[in-house]
Regions:
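Dinucleotide-binding Rossmann-like beta1-alpha1 core, especially the glycine-rich loop
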Residues: 62-135
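Mid-domain catalytic core of redox enzymes
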Residues: 37, 237-360
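Active-site/ligand-binding neighborhood in enzyme catalytic cores
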Residues: 103-107, 113-253
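Glycine-rich FAD pyrophosphate-binding loop
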Residues: 35-61
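Short catalytic/ligand-binding loop motif for oxyanion handling, primarily in non-cytosolic enzymes
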Residues: 52-54, 102-103, 108-110, 175, ...
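N-terminal Rossmann-like FAD-binding beta1-loop-alpha1 element of flavoenzymes
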Residues: 16-44
Length: 400
């Protein structure tokens, strides 16, 4: 693998069997699979100055490993995904825990046995917990919609508390919505965990952090003799698309194209911009060993920011006397501003607009949109990895 800033003079896309746009999970997984499985020569074009997409991590001035685009916590139920990624990293045994700051009191989320006693007091909290156990059993996640369906005043009390203090104000900040705009089906999925496990992903069999960090994972994944990586390259400057062909640098390209960027930007927003939420991230390095007891604290009833992440709590890095935290402020995304589009706003009219963009490439048999931006959806890291593995299998099958 070579990683180069910019394209070399005389770059010839035709010398490659596949062009991958984007060096995040979707792009890197496809590049590796096609290179090692059927011997494709692959060029990866990355708009940013680094690989690893939003999972990119780096060391800050204090020597602390930070996640530049917000916290990324690896967890999966998918053994195929875990086995594939484990080829490129060893994992720590980090088990992610999240606390909600509810009116100054830190409570575990998802809401659990301990949370109930903190919220309602020991005696009342225990009564409510026993009612949950009797109704649903132990060690299960129960959406608050299910609590309300039971028409039980005790269960409704729990549902109302969780809705108001864990979900409502946090969601209003995260999505910029008023309560009447929040989809009731989303509200109803907010869970209560009937048990004592205070991990955020209590049932995921595979979880942890890459021992050397995410960027190192991607370096290992892309380290193949048939893969070349070109950073600081915007594919929009190279691509010309009509109904049946893609031209790169003015020449029709006949190889496979895996595209992981935003479809609307590829077409210069001709049909309109796809709406997203973005984040302002404020990093602060503090002269202390530890700022908070867990990796993430959500501010569900107060503050303008949605959450604070403390990276040392997640990475296990030992660096006495210094710690770096990050506060997240959610806001609407402005196309062309240099902001990062993080969360697709999955309203029906936005999905319809995306489908119209998708129609623009439906006759391009060698053009494969995959990933969070190209598919206009929310993906956890394991899910996008699985999607890229599936796409790779499809391409391999077509050329077997």
């Amino acid at each position: 693998m070579q990683i180069t800033s910019g394209l070399p003079e005389g770059f010839n896309a035709g010398a490659y069997d596949m062009i991958v746009v984007g060096a995040g999970y979707a792009g890197a997984v496809c590049a590796r699979r096609l290179a090692e499985t059927i011997g494709y020569r692959v060029a990866v074009l990355e708009r940013r100055s680094h690989i690893a997409g939003n999972a990119y991590d780096c060391t800050d001035e204090a020597g602390i490993l930070i996640h530049e685009y917000g916290p990324h916590i690896y967890h999966t139920f998918n053994e195929r995904v875990h086995n594939f990624l484990s080829r490129f990293t060893k994992w720590t045994d980090y088990q992610h825990k999240v606390l909600a700051n509810i009116n100054g009191t830190l409570m575990p989320v998802p809401f659990n046995h301990a949370s109930l006693k903190l919220a309602f007091g020991d005696e009342r909290g225990e009564e409510l917990y026993q009612k949950l156990v009797e109704t649903f059993g132990k060690d299960v996640k129960v959406p608050i919609m299910e609590l309300r369906k039971k028409n039980d005043p005790d269960l409704a009390e729990v549902a109302d508390y969780v809705y108001e203090n864990v979900f409502l104000h946090y969601t209003m900040k995260q999505w910029g919505q008023t309560p009447d705009q929040i989809d009731p089906s989303i509200t109803g999925r907010v869970p209560v965990f009937v048990g004592d496990d205070d991990r955020y992903f209590p049932q995921a069999p595979f979880q942890g952090m890459p021992q050397e960090g995410y960027t190192a994972l991607f370096e290992h994944m892309l380290d193949h003799d048939l893969i070349d990586v070109f950073c600081d390259v915007d594919a929009r400057d190279l691509f010309e698309i009509d109904e049946t062909t893609v031209k790169i640098d003015g020449k029709v390209y006949g190889g496979e194209i895996v595209y992981t960027g935003p479809l609307d930007e590829l077409f210069n927003l001709d049909l309109g911009a796809l709406p997203y939420r973005t984040l302002d991230m404020k990093f602060e390095t503090l002269d202390m060993d530890q700022f908070q007891p867990v990796g993430t604290v959500n501010y569900t009833t107060s503050e303008d920011y949605t959450r604070i992440t403390e990276f040392k709590n997640m990475t296990g890095q030992i660096l006495p006397g210094k710690t770096t935290i990050m506060k997240e402020y959610s806001k609407a995304y402005t196309p062309g501003s240099g902001e990062t589009p993080y969360y697709a706003i999955l309203e029906p009219e936005n999905r319809e607009l995306y489908e119209r963009y998708l129609e623009c490439v439906q006759n391009l048999t060698n053009f494969h949109p995959v990933g969070r931006l190209a598919e206009y959806r929310y993906y956890d890291m394991d899910a996008v990895t699985n999607s890229a593995l599936d796409l790779s299998d499809e391409i391999i099958a077509c050329h077997a």
